[in-house]
Amino acid sequence: MTLGITHLVHANVVCADFDRSFDFYTRVLGARLIGRVFEFDAAADFQAILDVTGSVRCKAALLTWSDDDAATYLDLLCFADERGEPVPRTAKQPGLARLGLRVRDMTATLARIREHDVPVVAGPVTLTPMPGRHRHVLTIRDPDGTMLNLMEFPELGSGRG
């Protein structure tokens, strides 16, 4: 028996500078804000699910690229201690290695990335993970170094899939 999981709901991206990362994901990558940017006491409000202790403030935003209420969203989080300094993650902590984001048009995507002087890590390259399934992949990094694979799926058209 399976758990009945149907899809990924959201991914958390923890950043060191909220405004810089918010600008990158909205202005450069075209995400839009769901609701509003909010701030809260992470330890008091979400200690169990965020695994934080002590006096830790969190600034957060939910971002999406879709009008579909059931679409996966990005949860952009920035944690700060009582002095307002970012709460660092250690290199020992395993975590998210990269995010894959589907794009409609790789040519337009590459032009936008270049327009905003975002360094390209790799690509675009064409991958064929299985016969008849091609992926054009452009790899960049967000301001904190999280790898992002911007992926075009030509055989699927511009819809979801």
Specify the residue positions occupied by each region the protein language model found.
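Vicinal oxygen chelate
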Residues: 1-4, 13, 36, 74, ...
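Flexible, small-/acidic-enriched active-site or ligand-binding loops
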Residues: 93
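Eukaryotic phosphotyrosine signaling hubs
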Residues: 96-98
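Histidine- and/or cysteine-centered catalytic micro-motif in compact active-site loops
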Residues: 38-39, 77-81
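Core segments of cupin and vicinal oxygen chelate
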Residues: 14-70, 108, 115, 131
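Short glycine-aromatic motifs
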Residues: 5-6, 31
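A short, acidic/glycine-rich surface segment
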Residues: 42-48, 82-87, 159
